[in-house]
Amino acid sequence: MSPARTAARTARRPTRAQARRRRWTWFVIAALLGVGIAVGISKINVQQAIRDITLPLQHDDIIRQQAADKNLDPAMVAAVIYSESRFRDQESRAGALGLMQITPQTAHVIEHLSGGTSFVTSDLSDPQINISYGCYYLRYLLDHYNGNEVAALAAYNAGTGNVDKWGGLDLNQSDIAFPETRAYVDEVLQKQQDYRAQYADDLGLNG
């Protein structure tokens, strides 16, 4: 979801397209398992193929670089990208763009805060720029909420105005009024742990 969010938000049901994608994902997993068993592909290779489908990771070099530059956990950055776009360059119905689903309005704010001068909307399709802007905004939110990850992630999804109404610096997951935002925060925190466990080397967490 976009970092810029209006106050009136309600939980969204999965669309038909999302439901089809989920069914297709499980179909592919079942097919991989079947083929692996049939042709004797190693268990490790099958597990890696399933991981690449269920927990994708792309642009890990950019994620590592931007996380180090912004003093962020690269696993959290990967988890935000997963929850926002499943690592697909796309545009949401709200006009949010790219891997970290940033609206042009929010991008212009980030440009101003970071001292940029030449941003154009099409830049948000560039993974380097999109992840750079998303990481800058995530770092800004973490600093704004004194390191409270729940508050920062909720603000990334629903906006700082809503988070301030729900508890601000002291926000807990149970305080989040929007079911969609609560589910978003839950997912990011869970995927953060999954990325740490599954991609420690790729994300530079073992060095």
Would you name each region that the model predicts?
Residues 42-207:
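Catalytic glycan-binding domains that act on GlcNAc-containing polysaccharides
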Residues 12-15, 36, 192, 206:
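Low-complexity, intrinsically disordered/propeptide-like segments
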Residues 23-25, 165:
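Residues in intrinsically disordered, low-complexity segments of regulatory proteins
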Residues 1-22:
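N-terminal Lys/Arg-rich, disordered targeting/topogenic segments
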Residues 25-43:
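Hydrophobic membrane-insertion alpha-helices, especially the h-region
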